[in-house]
């Protein structure tokens, strides 16, 4: 066939080589066009939607008021008995017989002793005042613990995802008690499904209250940036929904079979007054302990909470490659 083609007459100034080059160019253009047309579809299939529940406030706790009650009984204000007020010591000196039977030397010694007591009292008062000032400074900028737990579960844990979706729709994230309930329910949802656990990690740190909000937001933004879109969000009682989901917990027309997405990743970030010491996660028992510790934070200590999960919508995927590239700190449990 090639010999026959080569024997075919060609117009002048046209060679078989030029024909071959032009044909190759056409094929390349066709391949590029095909790639441009179908690449968005592939990207849509790799879309990672995310859900978010949370809120909080990093206000300093109110410090107890410091009050000073004056001496009772009128010891220093009873008429003109003490001549000009002050500490009122003149009445002590006659008692010891100043200028009388005990002689002047003993009275001088008593005066020196009293002066020493007064000086020490003034010094101690100044020292305690300074210490009180330091205590006030510490109480106005107390220590805050910030902790994060991440759990990678099999994609077949649809009941867990449904619980998180429903929690996002019903949670009161604008109050301390409501946020405490979110933390408890999210940790309970994970603790109830250990059969789906595959990966886990935990980290905790402590900072002063003045730096806590920035540290907390940095952690939250790092995790939220891994989503292509937040399709369900309830933050500080601001509820937002979007995307393809037709019903919370229901199947959408684009739903994929169980296991096709491979994983669900849940992140819980909390900030609380005091220490938050979580054990390093190397197995399922340590992951369980970390979840129980985090879920046990009382509402009066909890400052802020973020519960994040991906994928949120049916049809979106989180593959093993995504886990390796986006969540390298995770460990098999």
Curated annotation (Swiss-Prot):
Keywords: Cell inner membrane, Cell membrane, Membrane, Thylakoid, Transmembrane, Transmembrane helix. The chain crosses the membrane at residues 26-46, 92-112, 261-281. Residues 53-74 are annotated as: Disordered. Disulfide bonds: none annotated. InterPro entries: DUF1517, FLAP_modulator. It is a multi-pass membrane protein. Pfam families: DUF1517. It is found in: Cellular thylakoid membrane; Cell inner membrane. Its main location: membrane. It comes from the Bacteria. Disruption phenotype: Inhibited growth under dark-light cycles. Altered PxcA- and PxcL-dependent H(+) efflux/influx activities under fluctuating light conditions; prolonged light-induced H(+) extrusion followed by slightly decreased H(+) influx activity until light-to-dark shift. The double mutants missing both PxcA and FlpA or PxcL and FlpA have both reduced light-induced H(+) extrusion and later lower H(+) uptake activity. GO terms for cellular component: plasma membrane-derived thylakoid membrane. Residues 58-70 have a biased composition (Low complexity). Belongs to the FLAP family. Essential for photosynthetic growth under fluctuating light by modulating PxcA- and PxcL-dependent intracellular pH regulation via proton transport (e.g. transient pH reduction upon transition from dark to light followed by an increase in the light until light-to-dark shift). This is Protein FLAP1 homolog A. It comes from Synechocystis sp. (strain ATCC 27184 / PCC 6803 / Kazusa).
């Amino acid at each position: 066939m090639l010999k026959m083609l080569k024997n075919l007459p060609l117009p002048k100034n046209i060679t078989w080589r030029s024909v071959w080059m032009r044909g190759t160019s056409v094929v390349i253009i066709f391949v590029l066009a095909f790639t441009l047309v179908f690449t968005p579809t592939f990207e849509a299939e790799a879309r990672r939607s995310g859900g978010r529940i949370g809120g909080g406030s990093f206000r300093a706790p109110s410090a107890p008021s410091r009050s000073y009650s004056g001496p009772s009984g009128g010891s220093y204000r009873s008429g003109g008995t003490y001549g000009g007020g002050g500490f009122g010591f003149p009445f002590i000196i006659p008692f010891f017989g100043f200028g009388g039977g005990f002689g002047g030397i003993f009275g001088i010694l008593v005066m020196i002793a009293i002066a020493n007591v007064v000086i020490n009292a003034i010094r101690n008062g100044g020292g305690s005042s300074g210490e009180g000032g330091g205590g006030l400074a510490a109480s106005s900028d107390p220590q805050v613990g910030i902790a994060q737990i991440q759990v990678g579960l099999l994609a077949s844990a649809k009941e867990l995802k449904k619980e998180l979706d429903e929690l996002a729709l019903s949670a009161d994230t604008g109050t301390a008690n409501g946020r405490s309930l979110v933390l408890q329910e999210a940790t309970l949802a994970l603790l109830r499904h250990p059969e789906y656990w595959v990966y886990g990690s935990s980290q905790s740190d402590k900072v002063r209250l003045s730096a806590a909000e920035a540290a907390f937001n940095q952690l939250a933004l790092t995790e939220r940036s891994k989503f292509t879109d937040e399709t369900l969000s309830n933050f500080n009682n601001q509820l937002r929904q979007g995307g393809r989901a037709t019903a919370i917990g229901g199947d959408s027309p684009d739903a994929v079979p169980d296991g096709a997405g491979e994983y669900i990743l849940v992140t819980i970030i909390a900030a609380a007054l005091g220490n938050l010491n979580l054990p390093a996660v190397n197995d399922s028992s340590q992951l369980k302990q970390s979840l129980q510790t985090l879920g046990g934070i009382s509402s009066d200590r909890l400052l802020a909470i973020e519960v994040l999960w991906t994928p949120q919508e049916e049809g979106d995927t989180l593959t093993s490659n995504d886990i390796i590239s986006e969540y390298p700190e995770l460990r098999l449990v």
